[in-house]
Amino acid sequence: DEHCIFLNQEDRCGIHKIRPGFCRLFPLGRLYEDRSFKYILQTKECVKTDRQKIKVRKWLDIPELDQYEKFVNDWHYFLKDVAASLKKENASDGTIKQINIYVLKEFYMRGFGEEVSFYAQFEQRLKEVKAVLLK
């Protein structure tokens, strides 16, 4: 039996109690095109054969799914835009390192408060960082 040992009774990832986005998504994936994305079913990555139909929204079970999807999309294309800008400018390794550190500090080290929604704070921060990096 090739049953995934990490699936719980509901056949969902049981590795992490809050099921991070990547775990919630599996066995789905995202196909990014034209500044958007769509969900795809990864059939070769999951050995389970008796799959049942379920709506993506129900499978993901993420509060405020529309805002979450906007966040995922904005973040993905922000990173792509920064990478393209650095390539176009033929940025040095030192410049790339400085920008990576700046992005890490702004989005991972600088906290997000609880008084305002994460998504609103992220959007504001993304706008500020884009103004600096993508002039």
Question: What is each of the regions a protein language model found here?
Answer:
Residues 1-3, 7-135:
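Short loop/turn segments that flank or connect secondary-structure elements
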